[in-house]
Every structure is written in C-alpha cells, then in structure tokens.
Amino acid sequence: MLLNDARQQIADACSHLSDDGLVVGTAGNLSVREGDLVAITPSGLPYQEMRPDLVAVVEYATGKQVEGPLKPASELDLHLTALRATGQMSVVHTHSLSLIHI
C-alpha cells in the first residue's frame, strides 16, 4: 500500500475530528503530500468509518488516482491548488459546527 504513514495519519485525524465533534458525517476532507503523491480522504465516506486502506492516493502533478478503492474527495482540486500554492505538506478542510454557531 502506498503512503502507509500518511494514510494512517489521515484515518487517525478523521477519528479525532469526529470523536471531538468538530465534524459531522462527510463534511470536509484531509490530505497529506509525500513527494509526488498525495493521500486524500475519499468522497462520501463518513469520518467515523475512515480506515487507512480506504484513503485515496493521487499523483501530485495530475490528480490522477493511483491507489484506493474509493474516489478521491470532490475537493481534490482545491487541495492540490492549496498544496502547490503554499508548499505545505497537508490540508485540513472542515465544516466545523463551532464555526457556524452564533
């Protein structure tokens, strides 16, 4: 399996975000870049169901999926653009309930 550590980090982060009530269901995505590959949460899978083997892996340059049984997050282009523009190694995009409460 490609990017084992990155996929495990994403699964762990999804669990923490869900357990801490920071996300609900499938709201948001996480990605981690290692070299010329990016691990990213799959589309439509609730955070509490995330496992490393379900995390999608895509090419950093093209976004083409190279591993994972599920489609990458629908916001893949947003993640790739953010990674390229900032030079950072990861992106966390959530729809946190605490950000919309008044």
Model-derived features with residue positions:
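Conserved small/polar residues in nucleotide/adenosyl-binding loops
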Residues: 100-102
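Short glycine-aspartate micro-motif
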Residues: 91-93
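Catalytic metal-binding/acid-base residues of hydrolase active sites
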Residues: 97
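An anion-binding catalytic pocket shared by soluble metabolic enzymes
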Residues: 2-89
